[in-house]
Amino acid sequence: MTDFILKISPNIILGPYTVTRLGQNALEWGSRYMVIMDPILKETGTAEKITAPLAERKIEYFVFDELTQAADTQTLETILNLARNSHIHGIIAAGGGKTLALAKAACALFNEPHTSYDYIDGGAPTAGTIPLICVPTTIRDAFLFTDRVPLCDSRSGSAKIIKTQNGICKLVLWDPNLELTLTDKQSAAMGLETFSMALEAYLSRKSTFFSDMLIEKALQLMSYAADGSPTLTVTTPPEVLYTQAGCMASLGLASCSAGASTLLSLTINTRYKR
């Protein structure tokens, strides 16, 4: 086992209706935000649940939801231009993996003098970043707690992973109620991906007792959620259990190393843009 070095970042708030605290928490890092949002949230009526807490706290914001089917560099350049011209204090990302990836990359490159393609080709950002607040609407994200961002190179359509500065994401608000709009097939696919993430983290040569502890608990929670029927000892709703399991699996994977299944999933998502 490798040496154990513990540094918890970002702050994580997980539970039903935690999105209502978005406004009061966002004020800690600024009062003017760009909200990058998955367009499906507007169609399902979820978008207002995210923006309402900001309006209540008199936080200035504008929403960008013109996302393509992949977290590509062309969309990233559009986001960077809007963010820089708007003089924002930070970015709030609400959605799945591609939304969070674009927001994280935008925060990392906000003060950089070069385009995103210089970093796609191997450069490393060194300038200061702006704060990122993540509101995931899926149960897992393999790169959320790492200093890496998966992107699609618009020039070639290939998947690339760029390195970012540490400590970009300041807060993760994980609200299971935001995931209720997922279809049964989407939930099943994400559950399978979460299980694959947990398995490869547990078998990783870079695993630690901390990552093993998180993964074992994640698998236990997934088994409770899959059972579906409440018992005298387990009364937590399945959607909350799945969210807790996904969060722990993401943390466990980040504390060791991603493996073949994560990279295969990234490649498939980039290739078929789903």
PLM region descriptions:
Residues 1-90:
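ATP/NTP phosphate-donor binding region
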Residues 10, 111-209:
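A glycine/threonine-rich phosphate-anchoring loop and its flanking beta-alpha core
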Residues 19-22, 43-46, 73, 98-103, ...:
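Short glycine/serine/threonine-rich phosphate/pyrophosphate-binding segments
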Residues 50, 79-80, 99-113, 145-148:
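Short Gly/Thr/Asp-enriched flexible loops that form oxyanion-binding sites at enzyme active sites
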Residues 55-56, 82-85, 106, 123, ...:
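N-terminal loops that bind phosphate or other acidic moieties
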Residues 88-104, 137-139:
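Glycine/serine-rich anion-binding loops at beta->alpha junctions
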Residues 201-274:
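Active-site segments that bind and position negatively charged phosphate/pyrophosphate groups
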